[in-house]
C-alpha cells in the first residue's frame, strides 16, 4: 500500500517534470479523479493510467529506489494485461500505453516500449484521434485532449522510430486532418475558458 503522501509526491513529480514536455493528461482533471471529486473513465483503464503516472513520477524523482520504481511499472503493466480493457478503446488507456511505452524505453526495455506504442497507435486510430471530426458533438476541451494525446503519440512514435531505426507506425500528414494542439495552460480556470473562445 502506498501512502497518500507518496502518491501526491509522485503525481506532483510527474506534472512538474514530465508533463511540461508531454502534456497528454490534463492535470486538474487527473487530480480531481484521484481525489474522487470527478468521475473516472472505465476503472481498469484509469487504474492503469494512475500507476503509469506514478511510475513516471518515480522515474522523474531519480531516486535510488529502483525496486519501488519497478513495482509501480510492473503494476501498470499487469493492469494493462487484462484483455477486457482491450475490448473498448478509450483515451485513458491510450494515455497509459503511451506512458508505459516511454517508461519501458527509460527502463531499457525497448521492445516492450515499442509494443506498448503499437497498441496505443491502434487504439488511437480506432478512436479517430488522427481526425478532427468537426461534425462530432464534443466539447472544445474534449477535442483539445484528443489532439494532445494524438500529437504526443506522434512525437513518441517519431522519436522511437529514429532511436531504434524502425519504421514509423503513424500515417503521413496527408491521412491526418487533426489540428495541432492549442498553446494554452492547464491551470485551473484557464484551459476551459480559453478553449471555449477558440474557433
Residue ranges and their predicted role:
Residues 56-59, 112, 132, 169:
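Short, electropositive, low-hydrophobicity segments enriched in small/polar residues
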Residues 96-99, 116-120, 149-152:
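Extended, hydrophobic/aromatic-rich amphipathic alpha-helical segments that build helical scaffolds
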Residues 13, 36, 74-79, 124-199:
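Fungal transcription factor middle regulatory core
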Residues 67-71, 115, 172:
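Short sequence/structural elements of tandem HEAT/ARM alpha-solenoid repeats
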Residues 58-61, 79, 99, 116, ...:
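Short alpha-helical scaffold segments that flank and stabilize functional sites
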Residues 107-123:
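Classical protein tyrosine phosphatase
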Residues 1-92, 97-109, 136-141:
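C-terminal transcriptional activation/regulatory domains of eukaryotic transcription factors
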